[in-house]
């Protein structure tokens, strides 16, 4: 069985993440999909980064009744920086009988040649590229082992937009997998943004 690895900050998870995960397990060879939250992304604003445990718990609650999905907290156990190749090596040692596919958005595919050891990633693991608004992928030029999933759903919601809207007091109950999590996220964001003493 092919196991898809969905990396990201999930800051917070939203319905777009779940719609994509559902599509990939129903319309591609992926039988299981593991969410791999990143403790820290050096390219993103850490001031609004929700606590790692909270992000993982929100994902776990959202997927708790779906056996196709699970959360992997492996990156908190690995040294920084959290390069994808290091995480995949660790997973391959922990789960030697699994076949892994790396799921990446078309936006990340555009800069994939700048990823650490990207040639090794492509040589050892399947890459499944999903569409993102504003980014085109020419699947006729993709290397062997890479595939572009044209029909995967694109829901134009971002975690950044969710955080901003929650801080503005907007009602986002239909954007989040768990409507009741909005208050928890709002409280955590206020803590993140309050001056540290």
Swiss-Prot record:
InterPro entries recorded:
Cyt_trans-like, NadD/NMNAT, Rossmann-like_a/b/a_fold
Catalytic reactions of this protein: nicotinate beta-D-ribonucleotide + ATP + H(+) = deamido-NAD(+) + diphosphate
> What residue stretch is flagged as signal peptide?
none
- Record-listed E.C. numbers: 2.7.7.18
Its keywords, alphabetically, are: ATP-binding, NAD, Nucleotide-binding, Nucleotidyltransferase, Pyridine nucleotide biosynthesis, Transferase
Statement: the UniProt record of this protein carries the keyword Methyltransferase: no
**GO MF terms held by the record:** ATP binding; nicotinate-nucleotide adenylyltransferase activity
Regions that span the bilayer: none
* EC main group: transferase
Would the keyword Transferase be found if you checked this record's keyword annotation?
A: yes
One family name in Pfam for this protein: CTP_transf_like
Annotated GO biological process: NAD biosynthetic process
Q: What pathway, per the record?
A: Cofactor biosynthesis; NAD(+) biosynthesis; deamido-NAD(+) from nicotinate D-ribonucleotide: step 1/1
Record-stated family: Belongs to the NadD family.
Purpose of the protein: Catalyzes the reversible adenylation of nicotinate mononucleotide (NaMN) to nicotinic acid adenine dinucleotide (NaAD).
The record's annotation in HAMAP family points to: NaMN_adenylyltr
NCBIfam families linked: nicotinate (nicotinamide) nucleotide adenylyltransferase
Q: What is this protein called?
A: Probable nicotinate-nucleotide adenylyltransferase
- Which gene specifies this protein's sequence? nadD
């Amino acid at each position: 069985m092919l196991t898809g690895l969905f990396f990201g900050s999930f800051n917070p998870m939203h319905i777009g993440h779940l719609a994509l995960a559902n599509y990939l397990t129903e319309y591609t060879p992926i039988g299981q999909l593991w969410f791999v939250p990143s403790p820290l992304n050096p390219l993103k604003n850490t001031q609004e980064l929700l606590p790692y445990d909270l992000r993982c718990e929100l994902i776990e609650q959202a997927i708790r009744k779906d056996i196709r999905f699970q959360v992997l907290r492996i990156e908190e156990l690995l040294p920084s920086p959290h390069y994808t190749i290091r995480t995949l090596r660790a997973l391959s040692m922990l789960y030697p009988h699994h076949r892994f596919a790396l799921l990446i958005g078309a936006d990340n595919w555009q800069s994939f040649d700048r990823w650490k050891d990207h040639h090794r990633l492509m040589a050892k693991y399947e890459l499944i590229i999903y569409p993102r608004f504003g980014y085109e992928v020419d699947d006729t030029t993709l290397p062997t082992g890479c595939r572009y999933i044209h029909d995967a759903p694109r829901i134009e919601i971002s975690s950044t937009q969710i955080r901003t809207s929650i801080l503005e007091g907007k009602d986002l109950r239909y954007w989040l997998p768990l409507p009741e999590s909005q208050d928890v996220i709002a409280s955590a964001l206020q803590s993140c943004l309050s001056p540290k003493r």
